[in-house]
C-alpha cells in the first residue's frame, strides 16, 4: 500500500505520490551547509585572511615613510565613502532610517575606535602580537556580552573550540608580556598591548550593536558611516596629535592601497558573518588573522617568531577546525532526521 511505502507520508492513499528526488540530490541537500557554517566560512576566508595582511602592511608603510597611524586610518576610511553611490542609486538614506540612525552611527564609531586602537598598537607592538591581543579580547568580550545581553548560549563543542583558540592566543602572547623592557620603551610597548585590548573590546561591542540593526541596507550603511565617522573624527586629530606625512615612494602608496581594499573586504565579510553565526564564534574564526600576521611577520617583516608562536598558531587553527566542523555536522544530522 501507498501508506506503507517509505517515500509516502499521506493519510489518504488516493492522493498522488510526490516524485522522489534522485539520490545525488538528496545527498547534496543533506550536506548543504547551514547559515551559521556559511557565516563562519565567510568570516574565515573573507574576514580573517585578508585582515591578517593589514597589520604587516601598515607596519611596512610606517617603516618606509613614517606614515602616522591616524593618516593610515583616514586613507582606509576614504575607501568606504564610494559606498554612498549604490545607496543613492537604490534610494536608501545614507545615514540609515531615522529611528535607528543613532545606533548605526554608534556602531560605526565603535568600529572606528577599534581599528584606531589596532593601528596605533601595531606601531609599537609586533603585528602578530597586536592582532593576538585584539582578537582574544574581542572573543572573550563577545562571549560574555552575548550571554548576558542576548542569552544566546554555546554548545560544548563551541566552548571547546572557543577556549582552545583563546589558549592558543595566550601561548602566543604570554611570553612576550613577561619580558617587557624596562624604561620608556617598555611603557610604550605596554600601552600598545592596552590599546590592542581596548580595540578588541570596542570590536565586540560594535558587533553586538550591529546585530541589533534590522533594515535592508544595514551593511552598506554601516560601512559608509564607518568612513564618514572616521574622517570627521580623525582628520582634526591627525593635525593635533600627529604630523601628516605625504608618502613619496611606491611601496608606501602600494601598502596604503592594499590596506584600504583588504580592510574593506574584511569589514564587509565580518558584517555579513555576524548576522549568521554567534559573535563569539565569528571572533574565534577571525583568529586566523593572527596566523597570517605571524607568517608575514616572519617572512616579510623578518621579525622573530618564537616556538611559542608556532605552537599557539597550531592550536588556533585546530580550534577553528573544531568550530567549523561542529556546525557543519549539526546541519547534516538535522537534514537526515527530517
Swiss-Prot record:
It is found in: Membrane. It comes from the Eukaryota. It is a multi-pass membrane protein. Residues 1-21 are annotated as: Disordered. The keyword Membrane applies. Its main location: membrane. Belongs to the SLC35G solute transporter family. The gene encoding this protein appears to have arisen by SVA-mediated retrotransposition of the SLC35G6 gene in the primate lineage. This is Solute carrier family 35 member G5.
